[in-house]
């Protein structure tokens, strides 16, 4: 790739050396990293292989399970529903899902769900051992068991499942065409952005390029699917519908998504979101509150838990010096999303940089945090 005038080529090359050292040390198996500045390619490199069990070489066209980066797509669908006047940020969820009534549930708004301050438990599954690939079954279980542990707005605690599953169901119920969540996602987001290699579930034509995720014992639960494809088979299901973790994509498609965010909701002349909502999404709404989901692990590793710095569904670097996957050197307004132990996207509007990292070999939550901070700092340090 030709040298980008916005980067010091030698310093950006440190990124290649660092990832290769990590792979040699066995920290993870491989991946692909892409960097753009001002919309122009600056770095694109593949590394290693998918893993010891499904040992495919990583290619630029490889399809990765995105895990919780999927939540970023659900955020956009909620924003589009706001733009169309179906809901507002302060609309209580129970206005859209009447079954979600009673007690503290009725205080929970879309704002609380997006900022992970709804007071719902930070659980990975609604019922132990249930299949998670059918959205209707998961929603039925959530409506039965999801009881707030504290009033909405009191604390910040990342919700792996409940918040975005419920918002995905709300989007489905609000749709005047009666479409499935999967179809709304494809027709209202992926197709307008030209994300042709992105889908909810592993679309049949993508299966041969899909790198089946290796969890390496670093995740607290199984992810069962109805086809009985293994302990984490939900991530191989063609028709999975999981608004919190279920999408697959490529580095190229995810860069298109990141660039849309950097450009304020528009890409290649197609606007999928108004600038006001993008601005709201990248505004910190959680004050100085830490994210309780990560705080204990950071402290145990010898760090200081920083403020959560959450916008509307997106994480933000923030002005404080502290641990950040986006890099300690990132501009304060850098924002993006990450997925379990593997995937990361961010955009730095101040410097005009967009970053996509899709890796194989799932790391623990804390190791993943340190890994991305270290690698992303190389990118920031190389910027001119």
Identify the meaning behind each predicted range.
Residues 3-66, 88, 372:
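Short, conserved catalytic-motif segment at the N-terminal edge
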Residues 13-20, 33, 39, 62-91, ...:
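Active-site SXXK
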Residues 29-31, 42, 180, 341-344:
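Short loop/turn microsegments at loop-to-beta-strand junctions
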Residues 42-43, 345-346, 352-361:
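Short, well-ordered beta-strand elements
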Residues 51, 103-329:
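Short, surface-exposed loop or secondary-structure junction motifs
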Residues 89-103:
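Short, glycine/proline-biased beta-turn/loop segments that scaffold the active-site neighborhood
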Residues 334, 341-350:
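Short, surface-exposed beta-strand/loop micro-motifs that present aromatic residues
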Residues 361-384:
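Generic C-terminus detector
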């Amino acid at each position: 790739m030709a040298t980008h005038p916005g980067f010091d080529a030698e310093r950006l090359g440190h990124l290649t050396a660092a990832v290769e050292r990590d792979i040699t040390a066995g920290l993870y198996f491989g991946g692909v990293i892409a960097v753009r500045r001002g919309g122009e390619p600056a770095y694109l490199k593949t590394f290693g292989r998918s893993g010891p069990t499904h040992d495919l070489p990583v290619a630029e066209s490889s399809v990765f399970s995105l895990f919780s980066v999927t939540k970023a797509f659900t955020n956009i669908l909620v924003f589009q529903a706001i733009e169309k006047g179906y809901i507002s940020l302060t609309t209580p969820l129970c206005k859209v899902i009447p079954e979600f009534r009673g007690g503290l549930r009725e205080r929970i708004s879309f704002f609380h769900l997006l900022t992970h301050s709804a007071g719902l438990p930070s659980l990975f599954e609604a019922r132990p051992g249930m299949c998670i690939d059918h959205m209707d079954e998961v929603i039925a279980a959530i409506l039965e068991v999801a009881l707030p542990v504290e009033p909405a707005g009191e604390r910040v605690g990342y919700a792996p499942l409940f918040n975005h599953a419920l918002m995905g169901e709300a989007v489905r119920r609000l749709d005047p065409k009666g479409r499935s969540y999967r179809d709304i996602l494809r027709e209202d987001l992926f197709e307008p952005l030209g994300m042709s290699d992105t889908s909810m579930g592993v679309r049949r034509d993508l299966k041969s390029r899909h790198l089946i995720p290796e969890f390496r014992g670093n995740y607290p639960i199984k992810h069962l699917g109805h086809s009985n494809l293994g302990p984490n088979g939900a991530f191989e299901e063609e028709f999975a519908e999981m608004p919190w973790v279920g999408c697959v994509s490529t580095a190229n498609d995810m860069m298109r998504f990141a660039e849309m965010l950097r450009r304020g909701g528009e890409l290649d002349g197609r606007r999928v979101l108004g600038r006001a909502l993008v601005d709201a999404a990248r505004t910190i709404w959680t004050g100085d509150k830490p994210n309780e989901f990560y705080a204990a692990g950071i402290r145990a590793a010898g760090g200081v838990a920083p403020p959560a710095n959450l916008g509307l569904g997106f994480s933000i670097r923030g002005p404080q010096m502290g641990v950040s996957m986006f890099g300690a050197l990132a501009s304060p307004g850098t924002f993006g999303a990450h997925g379990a132990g593997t995937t990361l996207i961010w955009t730095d509007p101040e410097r005009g940089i967009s970053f996509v990292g899709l890796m194989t070999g799932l790391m623990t939550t804390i190791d993943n945090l340190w890994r991305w901070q270290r690698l992303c700092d190389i990118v920031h340090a190389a910027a001119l």
